[in-house]
Amino acid sequence: MMDLSSKDALSDVLKDTHAQSSDPSLWAIFGHQSSDNVHEGGNESVSVEQEIFDLSQLSERPVSETVSKASIPTNINGLSQVKPSALEKSQEVLSLQKLPIKGRRPAGRRGRPALNTSNSLERNGTRYVSAEAPISVKSSIPAIPRVTFERLCYESAIASNLPPNALSPLEAEMLSEILENPTWLSLYLSIRNGICYLWHRNPTLYVSFNEALGIVREKKAFPLASLAFEFLSRNGHINYGCIYIISSLKLDESLSQKTVAIIGAGMAGISCARQLTNLFAQYEQDFLSRGEKPPRIVIYEASERLGGHIYTHMVPLSDNEVSEKSSLATTVNATNECMVNLLTDSLIGMPTLDSDPLYIISSQQLSLDAVHTRNREFILHDIENGRIDTEHVQRIFRLFDALLFYFNASASKQPLHSLITPPEQEFIQKLDQIGWYISIEAFPLQIKDTLSEFLGNSANTLTSLLHLTVLDLKIFEWFKEYLSQSLSVSLENVYPGSIPNLNLLLGENVASYSFKHGMADMLNSLASTPSPLPILFDQCVHTVKLEDNTVNLSFVNETTVSVDKVVICIPMDKLNTHLITFEPPLEEKKLKAIDRCHFTNVKKVILIFKTQFWEPNISIFGSLPQDSGRNFIFNDCTRFYEHPTLSVFVKVEGIDFMKDDDIVNGIVSQLKKVYKPKSEAINPIRTIISNWENNSYTNHSSYQISNLFLEEDYAILSEPIDNTVFFASEAISQKNSGSIRGAFDSGILAARDVLASLIGNVVLPNTLVIEENLEQPRKTYGTKRNAQQALGKEGERENKEKRISYHTEYLRLRQKRLDKEQQECDLLIAELLGPSPVPPSRPSANPYLLYQKTQWHVCKTLADQDKQRVTGDPEARATKNEIRAKLGKTWRALDSLGKQPWVDEINARRANYSTRLEEYQRQINSYNVRVAQIKSEHQRRCESQPIPEDEAKLKLLAEQEDEHLHPEKEGMSVENSDDDYHDDLDYEDSISEVFPDNFS
């Protein structure tokens, strides 16, 4: 490490700051706060003559000067753009008139107030559907083939994290009772998917209500479109993020206005505030109909910056510290600055980038400069034997990823397709792709209580089955350590189902993204676009007191504010401490749920170098675990920071006694062991360490579900208090807990609940679908005939299309019933017989391919030696083509006796394949016989049941419709008949059956 100053100068700079290290290249983040040398502004650094930087001296506000000024609202109770003192801000902004108490309202669904509100149709002036409605059907449907449009709608529903062919759990809770009719349900899903298409077609523009109604094809479906639009808008599936919603209403300044306070300016608080801004603009008419303006939003942040755990800092570099080969030196108008993230460097698109709302906001709405990565390149070194072959490492990685998939899939609730294709069979298929085979009849893996125990037992079991070597097990242990560092938690604390997207963290083709100007750039843009959110810094709330329908907030600066709604967006562990006091206190069940949350701490060490000495274009590298000493895993951040940079995550547990410079020395020492020939270049010019545990407001780096956490704790943590105090945190999100995405989702859901408490839940209309009168078909047909006479040939063609609607609807409903019966039959087969036997994979018939697979490492060593001898470079490595050429040359050099071992192995595999194929044929024949029996019995049982009433009614109407369409059949004469001649005896027999007594 570089010595940049003398000992005396060091003591002068760190006087009374209690910095954790005296190393000039070491920055202690979040140490003891000091008021000396505080520099106002955004991501600007403190200039110190001795070139020692202590981030505890920095102002924590990373927002640019323009954004920070715009963050303070104007024209609200006389607020000024100049930063006032805390007392002045409290007196000017927070002195709100106490709103009149309106009393408690009757509770509605799930204990929420049953307010009298209108649905979307009524708000927009369409209380019923008529021919004079100003909204045009099909106006939002693009001029593309219908098959293409339906495919786009299907993909858009998936991108909105909704099942395209079924109701989501929230939709089922709201609409399952009123959408019992399969026809209505199918129509609703098609409309809902179409609205999702309108949003994902261009998420920079919000989807208006009239545009959503234009997705329907008939006016009778307008109420369903209204419901779908309400659900998608309120739950944040559409119209989220940085969108500008035009308001055409004139607000009366004399109207009253409520206030919604948000405590905390992290990702949860900013996303909640931005979503509330969008919702209040969309539902402006609802508030005006109540005689009030849309509520104002105020965000209170205890620190001097926004972001919480999202922290980006600018590192200044001198000219001689920037290498000519780095991207900083080659960028036009580039400054000698390096933006580093103190926690998360990248976000994972879960499950894909198209379905990640944060990626949609950052890439399409904000157009931030993103860096994409898809495949993780792992480079491992053996300190004694050098670098390990990449394909060897990748093979063990795919085995490790398959184990994570099986652990995650077995613990979750399986849908229909997973019952037919269970995790065991998919795991076997993944191994078969790698080149290993195990039998499903003797499946060896068993789910254990923790992930650590599962991986340990699986490694022991698979060692004998797959003939894993000692090197394979060392690589496997390295991946276990990497997963533990990625999760920031010990694998002993990860139990089945605790991390829903566990297999995506190490996925082979999972896309991730970051931002060149730091992760805070996304949050700052979200807070300032399209209009700045009103954020007040240095406002630490210590008491939340509920009185009737209002909330009194008391701050540490002895000011008090009365608001109508409060959203608590601070870390969950702070609710169980004395940082914020609740009056009345929180319920015991909520406190117990908070105790079951698990918060961990890690130190992130960032090393900036002048030149890059490690392999380019890689993601992660490290060395195999040693018998003694701590093993570090290095993340290449060069593509993020545009300068040669490595980051290392170090667990705080067990190293509390170590100083920061000791940790850095250990990391640099391991780097020098891995890259011995380049040890002289391994000298960082800057070192940054994050110490989150020393921060008063975010004294942990990550959140993780403990093994004591219960599934119902999610609902307990998010449950509001008296429909007035709401909660949002990364711990509340069930799908993405402990992540930035989870904090964003919790803010969206909290905004939904706040809106429902202000204007009420979605009001279900009395009639979902305005249908034709089905009980008087003859009158309807008569009306159609009159219309046909009035309209002529064009009306005849149009009414003819309407006449076949009953027949088409009957066929569709009948086919849906048959599909449901087939689905039930498949489930029954899966439950009784299990999955279908898997055919054995055909072995290779070429002995050279087997030789190539087994002798790759030997020929690679020979090719490397040849390359080093020719080039004279002891570090030279042969390319893949050169290794393949060496393989072919050595194979051709072998005689028939030398090739015989591989030929014998191929013959043995063929014999084994023949035996397995015969066994498979026997099993599949027996399986097919049992399947045919089950299908026959199931079909007989279904045919014995009566046809559903709706289908029977449509069948009758279809038959009547067919009679009206072909009336000539009834009056067909004998001369015009094409039927064959019938014997008179048949005619007499039919007459005798009708008149048995009187006929003779």
UniProtKB/Swiss-Prot annotation:
It is found in: Nucleus. Component of the SWM histone demethylase complex composed of at least lsd1, lsd2, phf1 and phf2. Interacts directly with lsd2. This is Lysine-specific histone demethylase 1. Residues 104-123, 780-800, 959-1000 are annotated as: Disordered. Residues 959-972 have a biased composition (Basic and acidic residues). One of its GO terms (molecular function) is promoter-specific chromatin binding. GO terms for biological process: facultative heterochromatin formation; heterochromatin boundary formation; mating-type locus imprinting; pericentric heterochromatin formation; regulation of replication fork arrest at rDNA repeats; replication fork arrest at mating type locus; silent mating-type cassette heterochromatin formation; subtelomeric heterochromatin formation. Catalytic component of the SWM histone demethylase complex that specifically demethylates H3K9me2, a specific tag for epigenetic transcriptional activation, thereby acting as a corepressor. Acts by oxidizing the substrate by FAD to generate the corresponding imine that is subsequently hydrolyzed. Has a role in regulating heterochromatin propagation and euchromatic transcription. Also has a gene activating role. InterPro entries: Amino_oxidase, FAD/NAD-bd_sf, Flavin_monoamine_oxidase, HMG_box_dom, HMG_box_dom_sf, Homeodomain-like_sf, SWIRM, WH-like_DNA-bd_sf. Its cofactor is FAD. GO terms for cellular component: chromatin; Lsd1/2 complex; mating-type region heterochromatin; nucleus; pericentric heterochromatin; subtelomeric heterochromatin. The gene is lsd1. Residues 153-249 form the SWIRM domain. FAD binds at residues 260-302, 328-329, 908-909.
